[in-house]
Structure formats: C-alpha cells, structure tokens
Design a protein with these regions (language model features):
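Positively charged, low-complexity intrinsically disordered leader regions
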Residues: 1-63, 67
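Phosphate/diphosphate ligand-binding glycine-rich loop within oxidoreductases
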Residues: 44-136
Length: 136
C-alpha cells in the first residue's frame, strides 16, 4: 500500500475481484513470467515484505508465494501457529494490528474463514486468502 493511501483491498474469496480484474491480473502474470524467462530483472517489490501465516501446513503455497516475492525483489516473514502466539495466547485482532504495522501485505492459510476475515478487519495492509476450509 502506498504511504498516505486509505484504501485497503483484501482478497478473501473469489468474488472479491471482477472478471476484468482477473483478466488484467492474468495478463500481468503472463508478462512478468515472460520477463523472468528472458532473465530480465524486474523487482517492483523491493523494500516490501510479505508475512505468510500458516495454520495449515503447505508446500506449494509457501514456495509459490516465497519464490514470487524474492524474484520480484521483496522479502518474506514466515509464521506458523507452532512458532508464535497466533490464535492462542494472543487474540487474532491483536495479531492483525501488530503484524500489519510491520509488513506490506499478509497471506494467511488457515482452517476458518471467520479467522481470516477477523484478521483482515483489523489489518492496516491487504490480506490474501492462502486457503481456508471454505475458499481457496
């Protein structure tokens, strides 16, 4: 999110984007992937940090988000429920407030859609649904 911007847009389920927005994203992804294949340096995410929160373990989700951030110049903070107080000793709302002050975007892979939505409601940065029992 740009400094001074007040618009926070989350991606919590498929209906959060319109068809033309998906078309734009897929076209941008195609262009970026082609640049990568051509060894063109393209790092628009320099000095940006993604927090990945995993309540549900994953290989492909973690690798795809992490590799994408690094390839585009960003960095990643990987959090698991086993290695943090997320959802246990610390309410999800407090975690959202604190974590979102330190990163530029958050991806969450969790069991409950309501937990994802609660985090997003208290986040200062965009939140992406990495998977819930309801949406993927």
């Amino acid at each position: 999110m740009k400094p001074g911007s007040t618009l926070i847009r989350h991606y919590l389920q498929f209906k959060d984007f319109r068809a033309e927005e998906y078309a734009y994203l897929f076209e941008r992804a195609r262009i970026i992937k082609q640049r990568f294949k051509n060894y063109e340096r393209y790092q628009p995410l320099t000095d940006r940090t993604l927090a990945m929160i995993f309540e549900k373990a994953s290989t492909r989700t973690r690798v795809s988000f992490e590799a994408g951030m690094y390839q585009m110049g960003g960095s990643v903070v990987n959090l698991t429920t086993e290695g943090s107080q997320l959802g246990r000793a610390e309410p999800i709302e407090d975690s959202a407030r604190v974590i979102s002050r330190m990163v530029d975007i958050v991806m969450i892979r969790t069991f409950e859609q309501t937990k994802l939505e609660a985090f997003a409601a208290h986040s200062r940065v965009p939140v992406i649904n990495g998977l819930t029992n309801e949406y993927h």
